[in-house]
Each structure stands twice: as structure tokens, then as C-alpha cells.
UniProtKB/Swiss-Prot annotation:
Its EC number is 2.1.2.1. Catalyzes the reversible interconversion of serine and glycine with tetrahydrofolate (THF) serving as the one-carbon carrier. This reaction serves as the major source of one-carbon groups required for the biosynthesis of purines, thymidylate, methionine, and other important biomolecules. Also exhibits THF-independent aldolase activity toward beta-hydroxyamino acids, producing glycine and aldehydes, via a retro-aldol mechanism. This is Serine hydroxymethyltransferase. GO terms for cellular component: cytosol. It comes from Verminephrobacter eiseniae (strain EF01-2). Keywords: Amino-acid biosynthesis, Cytoplasm, One-carbon metabolism, Pyridoxal phosphate, Transferase. The modification N6-(pyridoxal phosphate)lysine is found at residue 229.
Amino acid sequence: MYHRHLLVEQTDPELFAAIEAENARQEQHIELIASENYASPAVMWAQGTQLTNKYAEGYPGKRYYGGCEHVDVAEQLAIDRVKKLFGAEAANVQPHCGASANEAVFLAFLKPGDTIMGMSLAEGGHLTHGMSLNMSGKWFNAVSYGLDADEVIDYEAMEKKAHATRPRLIIAGASAYSLHIDFARFAQVAKDVGAIFMVDMAHYAGLIAAGLYPNPVPHADVVTSTTHKSLRGPRGGIILMRAAHEKAIHSAIFPGLQGGPLMHVIAAKAVAFQEALQPGFRLYQEQVLKNAKVLAQTLAARGLRIVSGGTQSHMMLVDLRAKGITGKEAEAVLGAAHMTINKNAIPNDPEKPMVTSGVRIGTPAMTTRGFKEEQARSTAELIADLLDKPRDAANIAAVRAKVDALTARFPVYG
């Protein structure tokens, strides 16, 4: 028998120390990684329930194990809520992550050697959209589209390449693109060449749910996403699809790619979707956009170039070359000053992928902890102050002290 009061603190002090240290880091640092956020206590509680004990291969009402009547309720709640949130005809909430969701789409519609077309990783795409080292680039003939001279998606070139290569699948979506994506135009091109149209909305899902970024669901055959990032849920994936594709997608997830779903995570997804359906979620996403705009404008005023000329979303790419520092070094020195960020390639980057000439900045996490325009502006000024003298130990210490004072006023978990 287990005693409920016997927790990690008593049973595994080494691990507990690491968890406590991470808790302290999250509270003390300004989180600027665009793909990270803070899940609510309710989401984390659901993920820590006894649902983790239950095997439930299959789908609600059609399981290969007994005793699934209660986890069926949890999964059906998640399905119904995510369909309502995005206006989808059908949904699968079982993917363990965004990459698994994308792989399921490939399994449902493609054969090895088929041609797929996605955004170039070097110009803002994602590795699961055809990168040569990824399964998507190894198993399929991957062709890519990119940006024009203004660092906007080159829709004309994309259309020409689609007609020239006749891909079986066209993917829209990105991991480092700050502007709106014209999903209707992609859909028309896919229709013209007879391709399945897939959208990976992982980065933009929270904004889309709030009606503040174009919704791909009316245009795409299939839409994939993560459930964390701007959605503020647990780490996991979802697939939204037209009703006509429901059977193919469900079969691709189980038994195609996965066995037992993570029912505790699915329960946490249901909580997150319910939170996103509340009026306060739109207010949160509106503030995410306001903070991103102020942050980008302030950095630009301090001499840093924002790729694509600005942002229409929660994130931005910052070109660091004017400061004579690489993304790798900037990530390290900003981290030393308690600002967590990630290095990121910029379009036509002369540096290696693990070095880069830029960083990617996002505002979802800072907004969750209560930052508004004033704090976003202060954060941008602190970033610029540090990058003006990135190798000055006294400057790093001074910026770190200001960061610590700022985060102390805005705890993540009160």
C-alpha cells in the first residue's frame, strides 16, 4: 500500500533537489523561449493523477482493455473541447507530442518516396517538415519553399514549385516565422495540384484559439499542434481533421504509431482546453501580442534588426550581427543574466546551425507571469543593455540584479 503523504522529497532527495532547483530557475528567470510557457496548477494536478495507471488502447467506447469507463469520459471531454475551441469537425487527442502528430499524418496519407513540400528549416520551418536528418526527409522526397527579399513567405515561388513538383502533401506552419500565414492561399495551391493540405499550428495555436491569428481549420485537410507553447497545456500533441479523414488519422495513431495513450496527459489536455475556452484566455493572448509588439519595437530602437520587419504573433527573430555577437554567445550571456532564450538561425545565416546569427524571442511565458507593456519594454531594454557589453562581467551582474528584482515582483506560482 502507498501512503499519499510519501512524496519525492522523502523517497528521492537527489531528484527532489533538481526539481526544486528548476522551480527556482523558472521563478527567477525571465522565460523568453517562444515554445515554452507555464502550465496552470490545475493542468499539472490532472497530469499527476491516478489516470497515469490506466492502459486504454483504442478510443472512447472502443477499447482493448476493461475498466476504461472513467478515462473514456476524460478523453471525450478533451475531444469535445478541442473541437469547440478550433471549430474542427473531428479530433484526435492521443499524440504524445507534435512530432508524433505530424508522423501520423504522414502515415495516414503517404507512402515512402512520396513528395512532400514544407517551409525550409533554414528560413523558419520545422525539422519535421522535411529536414534531411529527420524521418520526414529520410522517408520522403522533401522539397521546400522559403521567403522573399522582404523575409515574407514567397507565395508565388511556393505555388510555382508546387506545380512543378506535384507534392502529395503540402505543409504550412513554422517554428520561427513571426508574421501571419495565408492558409487560404496554401489551400488553393494544394487543391490545384491535388495535394493533401496539412497545417502545423503548434506555435500559433493559442492565438488561433483566441481568434487573434488566422485559423487554418476551415482551409486544411488536417491540422496538427502541440498542446503546450501558447496553449499553456501539458506537453503533448493533437490532430484536427475533416470528418472524412477521421478514420485514417485514428488508425495512424493507433495502432499505427502508438499503443496505450497517456490518459493522465489527455486529462490535462482537457483541463487546458477548458481554460482556453474561458473569456480570460483571449485577454491573455491579446496581452501576448501587445508585449511582443513592444518588445520588438524597443529592440529595433536599440539597433537590433527584427527579421521580417516585425511581428504579428507571439514571437520574433532578432538579427544580432550589428552587435558583433553570435546567437550561441548571446544565449549564454543572457542566461547568465537570468534571461532564458534560444539561439536561432536567421534567413541566409552565414553561421553554423549550432552557432547562428540570431535569437528567437517569445512573449507567452512572460505574459503568463503577469508582464504587461511596461515590463516587456523593460525586458527589451535589459536585453539590449546586455548585448551592448556582452563580455563585461560587471554589466552582466548589473543586468542580472535588475532581472531578479523584476521577476520577484511577478511570481509565476503565487
